[in-house]
Regions:
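Amphipathic alpha-helical coiled-coil "transmission" helices that mediate dimerization
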Residues: 176-230
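Juxtamembrane interface at the cytosolic side of transmembrane helices
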Residues: 1-6
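Interfacial "cap-and-anchor" motif at the non-cytosolic start of specific transmembrane alpha-helices
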Residues: 10-190
């Protein structure tokens, strides 16, 4: 899935940006870009997460109302990003706002799961962990929690575990789609076999009737010939 790949790339860029690894090893000569890297990469994370959610959960078919909600969130988040980028780059620091789209993704995943879509269970776990990581990091940012190794890298841990469960979700979805395809193929094969059997049966019955009719005609012809001889 191309959207999942773009999402992973955005996550990697965001992780390198907040840790300073990107500035240290990749763009050390571009300090201006470093000021924007966190905000731009985080926007990429949220954007591709929202689009991936639409595709993975098939919200257009399974829940048109939730699909409209996701579209609205994409438009609003994109508008906020452009406003930050063009007018107030310092607003990129308010990363706590990402809790809103992540909460919406989590809620929609739960709703689709409860409707019986099995692959959504791993999806819900994945984004539930990511949402928890964002919340924990926000608590540290607002000094509600002290900085420890676990709290400082909580978001990194969440991203890693989230990707693991998203991989499970994708694998589960592929397996289910394959099973559906196999069942449909078996139904088609069975129907074709039934049609062939019916065709053979009709042909046999037709041949039998033609044979019977031929015997009758031959018998009548014989009778007629005998009658003429007399």
């Amino acid at each position: 899935n191309i959207y999942y790949i773009l999402y992973i790339l955005s996550v990697g860029c965001y992780a390198m940006s907040i840790d300073g690894i990107g500035f240290q090893y990749i763009w050390p000569n571009h300090p201006v870009w470093n000021d924007y890297a966190i905000g731009i990469s985080l926007y990429g994370v949220i954007l591709w997460a929202l689009i991936f959610t639409r595709r993975f959960l098939s919200t257009r078919a399974k829940s048109p109302q939730m699909d409209r909600v996701l579209k609205i969130v994409i438009v609003v988040r994109s508008a906020v990003f452009l406003f930050e980028l063009l007018f107030y780059p310092e607003f990129f620091e308010y990363r706590i706002i990402e809790i809103i789209p992540l909460s919406i993704i989590f809620y929609i995943g739960m709703k689709i799961w409860l409707r019986g879509y099995r692959p959504a269970r791993f999806f819900v776990i994945a984004y539930g962990l990511l949402l928890a990581g964002f919340l924990l990091r926000s608590f540290v940012y607002f000094n509600f929690l002290s900085i420890t190794t676990i709290s400082h890298y909580s978001l990194h841990f969440s991203f890693v575990i989230e990707m693991l469960f998203l991989t499970f979700a994708l694998g589960d979805r592929i397996r289910i789609l394959k099973n559906k395809r196999d069942r449909a193929l078996k139904r088609i094969i069975h129907q074709n076999e039934t049609n062939l059997e019916l065709k053979d049966k009709v042909n046999r019955e037709l041949e039998e009737k033609v044979g019977e009719r031929t015997v009758e005609l031959n018998s009548k012809n014989s009778e007629l010939a005998e009658s003429n001889q007399k």
